[in-house]
Amino acid sequence: MAKDSSFDIVSKVEMQEVINAVHQAQKEIEQRFDFKNSKSSLELQDEKIILVSDDDFKLRNVIDILESKLVKRQVSLKALEYGKVQPAAGDTVRQEVKLVQGISQDKGKEINKLIKDSKIKVSSSIQGDQVRVTGKNKDDLQEVIALLRKQDLGIDLQFINYR
């Protein structure tokens, strides 16, 4: 009898790449002419990035710089969750950007429902912040991966432990 094949669906961010991208973005902000005499900065705190700038326009530029550095380091922008722009001390504005790690229960249920509705002969189960998909046929597993890549679930998905 053939052994069941499986893979895990996860949503993780490589933190070292985020750290590198934040440092590169901060360096670019310090060197750019349009940010001279500006209070613009980025700071990484645990699972969030704090953006500070003089006004909304410069804050938008800081976000653009950060996003370009993250993309260059292959960090998906779907892993970012932007908070509200808030006024801060000294006539500045600040914004928190959360790094979304793991698949929430709601997204896990949505993924399960998509897999079950597709009628592909596999089973899926939520295990903490990941979803495990098991099936007898590896082609069915490939089909599930293709199905999920086509869907826009609003989070970055990685497929790991393919066995």
UniProtKB/Swiss-Prot annotation:
Superkingdom, taxonomy of origin: Bacteria
GO terms assigned for molecular function: nucleotide binding
Gene Ontology cellular component annotations, sorted alphabetically: cytosol
Keyword match Nucleotide-binding: yes
Keyword Nucleotide-binding attached: yes
InterPro entries: DUF520, UPF0234-like_C, UPF0234_N, YajQ-like_sf
UniProtKB keywords: Nucleotide-binding
SUPFAM superfamilies per record: YajQ-like
Functional description taken from the UniProt entry: Nucleotide-binding protein.
Family: Belongs to the YajQ family.
HAMAP family per UniProt: YajQ
Protein known as: Nucleotide-binding protein DSY1969
